[in-house]
From Swiss-Prot:
It is found in: Secreted; Cell surface. It comes from Pan troglodytes (Chimpanzee). This is Complement C2. A motif (MIDAS-like motif) lies at residues 260-264. The lineage of its organism: Eukaryota, Metazoa, Chordata, Craniata, Vertebrata. Its main location: secreted.
Length: 752
């Protein structure tokens, strides 16, 4: 038999060698929906179903196998017919110290659930929540709290079960979701010494749910703005150096962009991945920070297109060029999704840089790292990606003190075989932030990256940043603090709230309206960073009149004790001069990492949410001193002491004639009391490494500096003193109409 006859017989016995590879059946329509194919009807093609808003596909996708049959990822049995099912939002499993209505097993799109608290408890969060078409509730978790714990009541998200009901320092709470729901966020949280719960608020969600771009963009932007604020925001670059910036002690950011290029990603989707990453690079280089960018694409194996060890990683043009040259076909021989290998490439890059710089050097230890993973599927080869994350955390020595040195953002794209549990496991867990998301498609991803870092907004909103390192000066710790002087005598203090406005007390100016000889000293007066400014305009509250109630036997009254000073020049921002955050503004909202749509009341509930709130003011010598603001019933007992002051208020019958609800109260035996000359200074809190002014020093019953010429000498009042020390501070939450009237063009105020 000749060679041609042998070949003919082989083709007859194995007809598959002569025909093209089998294709999958085309009877895959979905009732009420549509579908797309990544590679036609050929083996390896991913079929993705879509449904109208408010419905979700079941199954979400199918894969064409080499046998010519469709397989549903994760399914244990074949589904004969794909259908669109109605989206439902999870129901509350329990709600403490209150009631909710209506009580349903789950809620339809458009449905509402309302919450009310029992007597003695205050509602935090949203009183009414709305079920959205993506299967998520709008608003925030409703909590009925009495402020009794060291940490506020962490609440129970809808669909979750919590164990642990003690909220003292070191206490832990644990969460799990009811059946068929997926937990994102932290399954365990601990009450920390600063009164804040560790980790991220847990959310129970349907497996088919996804995030809207308008929710993801501000969440990512808020987290990034916090990170950027800690990464050398004042370092300037020179174009002549081609943006080539050396690693410095003042801080450096390594940004790692990981782009999925596996079989389930279409060429068009990969293009949008690249465009989104380019947007991020463009935004990040718009900030005056030291940054290096790594680019890694991956399928079955990773390809490092740009390493942070390459000098070009610090050049925006070179990084974007590397992205543009990324080729979809480079991975066509590897069809799997090896997320472990991609993250391990980051680990190896870090390890090489650590060896180059030295593990114990500040140059290595001061680098902050951010990883953004863009994927449309579940890791299906190479081992657990969590193992690589554990190695990364270990090499960076990530612990409670160094938690801010690593951020991992895990972003799933498309309603495919995206695994919520895996994304949540990879994403960082930080208080008030989210790091794991699923978006409906790559167009939504592009929209997120367009809006998450709007430089025009963020450069004016980095407020409340103080340097808390051990070697920082007092002024660097509180860079908003200013001194107000008539001629040469120091009289009052104030707080920088923008680059040209100072907030202070009205009684500093009660002796006349001519302020031409007054000066405001901004920055450290003992160094080259200090500078004196003339006052262009003083705005005194018209309601302030210290003698307004003299006829009632009240010799001095400090209601409306608030003033604004507009400086003749703008202040150049530096580590010694930077505004503090004012609550009820968009700037403070970003710093608090709160969602869009937050209100002034939300800020008050978050900042003044306990019976005794730790706070601070700045002393004459520039040091930061501690007080406790009394709220609720403790405010009443704090203020009642005024009735014992017979010199200033000899005929007082009602304490509230002197201490109105405009005032915050402090001054117990454990507290410091402000001295004369410290009036007008900020009363401020620390939250999430940022500082927020909630009041300003107004008046008190005791002057600890009386009779002393030494700024560092303060005398505590004897325990037998009558009346005991009490101090009163203008509550900025009660002065909102006046602040909005005069600062509406300066700050971006939230709804009341």
């Amino acid at each position: 038999m000749g060679p041609l006859m042998v070949l003919f017989c082989l083709l007859f016995l194995y007809p598959g060698l002569a025909d093209s590879a089998p294709s999958c059946p085309q009877n895959v329509n979905i009732s009420g929906g549509t579908f797309t194919l990544s590679h036609g009807w050929a083996p390896g093609s991913l079929l993705t179903y879509s449904c109208p808003q408010g419905l979700y596909p079941s199954p979400a996708s199918r894969l064409c196998k080499s046998s010519g049959q469709w397989q549903t990822p994760g399914a244990t049995r074949s589904l004969s017919k794909a259908v669109c099912k109605p989206v439902r939002c999870p129901a509350p499993v329990s709600f403490e110290n209150g009631i909710y209505t209506p009580r349903l097993g789950s809620y339809p799109v458009g449905g509402n659930v309302s919450f009310e608290c029992e007597d003695g408890f205050i509602l935090r969060g949203s009183p009414v929540r709305h079920c959205c078409p993506n299967g998520m509730w709008d608003g925030e978790t409703a909590v009925c709290d009495n402020g009794a714990g060291h940490c506020p009541n962490p609440g129970i998200s809808l669909g979750a079960v919590r164990t642990g009901f003690r909220f003292g320092h070191g206490d832990k709470v644990r969460y799990r979701c009811s059946s068929n729901l997926v937990l994102t966020g932290s399954s365990e949280r601990e009450c920390q010494g600063n009164g804040v719960w560790s980790g991220t608020e847990p959310i129970c969600r349907q497996p088919y749910s996804y995030d809207f771009p308008e929710d993801v963009a501000p969440a990512l932007g808020t987290s990034f703005s916090h990170m950027l604020g800690a990464t050398n925001p004042t370092q300037k670059t020179k174009e002549s150096l081609g943006r080539k910036i050396q690693i410095q002690r003042s801080g450096h950011l390594n940004l790692y962009l990981l782009l999925d290029c596996s079989q389930s990603v279409s060429e068009n989707d990969f293009l949008i991945f690249k465009e989104s990453a380019s947007l991020m690079v463009d935004r990040i280089f718009s900030f005056e920070i030291n940054v290096s960018v790594a680019i890694i694409t991956f399928a079955s194996e990773p390809r490092v297109l740009m390493s942070v060890l390459n000098d070009n990683s610090r050049d925006m043009t070179e990084v974007i060029s590397s992205l543009e040259n990324a080729n979809y076909k480079d991975h066509e021989n590897g069809t799997g999704t090896n997320t472990y290998a991609a993250l391990n490439s980051v680990y190896l890059m870090m390890n090489n840089q650590m060896r180059l710089l030295g593990m114990e050097t500040m140059a290595w230890q001061e680098i902050r790292h951010a990883i953004i993973l863009l994927t449309d599927g579940k890791s299906n080869m190479g081992g657990s990606p969590k193992t690589a994350v554990d190695h990364i955390r270990e090499i960076l020595n990530i612990n409670q003190k160094r938690n801010d040195y690593l951020d991992i953002y895990a972003i799933g794209v498309g309603k495919l075989d995206v695994d919520w549990r895996e994304l949540n496991e990879l994403g960082s867990k930080k208080d008030g932030e989210r790091h794991a998301f699923i978006l409906q498609d790559t167009k939504a991803l592009h929209q997120v990256f367009e809006h998450m870092l709007d430089v025009s907004k963020l450069t004016d909103t980095i407020c409340g940043v103080g340097n808390m390192s051990a070697n920082a000066s007092d002024q660097e710790r509180t860079p908003w603090h200013v001194t107000i002087k008539p001629k040469s005598q120091e009289t009052c203090r104030g707080a920088l709230i923008s680059d040209q406005w100072v907030l202070t007390a009205a009684h500093c100016f009660r002796d006349g309206n001519d302020h031409s000889l007054w000066r405001v000293n901004v920055g450290d007066p003992k160094s080259r960073w200090g500078k004196e400014f003339l006052i262009e305009k003083a705005v005194i509250s018209p309601g302030f009149d210290v003698f307004a109630k003299k006829n009632q036997g009240i010799l001095e009254f400090y209601g409306d004790d608030i003033a604004l000073l507009k400086l003749a020049q703008k202040v150049k921002m530096s580590t010694h001069a930077r505004p503090i955050c004012l609550p009820c503004t968009m700037e403070a909202n970003l710093a608090l990492r709160r969602p869009q749509g937050s209100t002034c009341r939300d800020h008050e509930n978050e900042l003044l949410n306990k019976q005794s709130v730790p706070a601070h003011f700045v002393a004459l010598n520039g040091s930061k001193l501690n007080i406790n603001l009394k709220m609720g019933v403790e405010w009443t007992s704090c203020a009642e002491v005024v009735s014992q002051e017979k010199t200033m208020f000899p005929n007082l019958t009602d304490v509230r004639e002197v201490v109105t609800d405009q005032f915050l109260c402090s001054g117990t035996q454990e507290d410091e009391s402000p001295c004369k000359g410290e009036s007008g200074g900020a009363v401020f809190l620390e939250r999430r490494f940022r500082f927020f002014q909630v009041g300003l020093v107004s008046w008190g019953l005791y002057n600890p500096c009386l009779g002393s010429a030494d700024k560092n000498s303060r005398k505590r009042a004897p325990r037998s003193k009558v009346p005991p020390p009490r101090d009163f501070h203008i509550n900025l939450f009660r002065m909102q109409p006046w602040l909005r009237q005069h600062l509406g063009d300066v700050l971006n105020f939230l709804p009341l």
